[in-house]
Amino acid sequence: MENMDKRSAWDRFYTESSSTTSSFKNFEWFFGFDSVRDFLMPLLRSSSHPDSPVQVLDMGCGTSALGPSIYRHSPVSVHVTCADISPVAVQLMQEKTRLEAVRPSNPSSRLQFVELDCTQLDRRYSPNSLDLIVDKGTTDALLRSKEGKGKAVLVLQQCFRALQGSGSLLQFSDEDPDARLLWLESAALHHDVGVQEVGQLRGVCYFCYQVTPRTPAKC
């Protein structure tokens, strides 16, 4: 797929994908929720607040069931925003959840789908407003596009602005740590970067890169 940093490419992709089947089916890049459940749930529990929900952004959600699955399975109260640059993908997911309501584990949880260019998170989110940002293949798509590398850095900067001091950015990727860690560490100054192996699927090894704001050293 070419021009993965362009809205028009994704509108075309989701239009064509939805027209090939009579009933809607979620499209998962890499893998689904069950493969990364053990990475997400501990973070949700550790990010929980006594008086407010955990704010979660599924960035570049497409038509994935990841965001709705977080909403469905999280025992703590979450407000999950599934955001994508493609209005076609957003409309498909809105229609899907309208026809098949997703019931949350926590009755105070909320789920929404919004059209949003992730290079412009500041148009929707104030600084220090998100607890968890999930990026499943979105940065990969940008880095593999001819004109997308600069946008990938901008997305990263926007994420850092929106994250709370105790928040986390999770990037799920098939890019080898030798390459991704080098890029993240050079672009994510004042942040800690770690990696864990998710596992292999269809012969491809996937990784979870976690980026968190660095806590200032105490004197």
Regions found by a protein language model. Name each.
Residues 166-173:
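Conserved beta-strand signature within the Rossmann-like core of class I S-adenosyl-L-methionine
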Residues 119-133:
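A short acidic, Gly/Pro-enriched loop at the edge of an enzyme's catalytic core
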Residues 178-219:
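Class I S-adenosyl-L-methionine
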Residues 27-52, 69:
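Conserved alpha-helix/loop element of class I SAM-dependent methyltransferases that forms part
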Residues 131-149:
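A short SAM/SAH-binding and catalytic strip from SAM-dependent methyltransferases
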Residues 149-165:
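A short glycine-rich, Lys/Arg-flanked "PGG" loop and its adjoining helix->strand segment in the class I
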Residues 55-121:
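Class I SAM-dependent methyltransferase SAM/SAH-binding core
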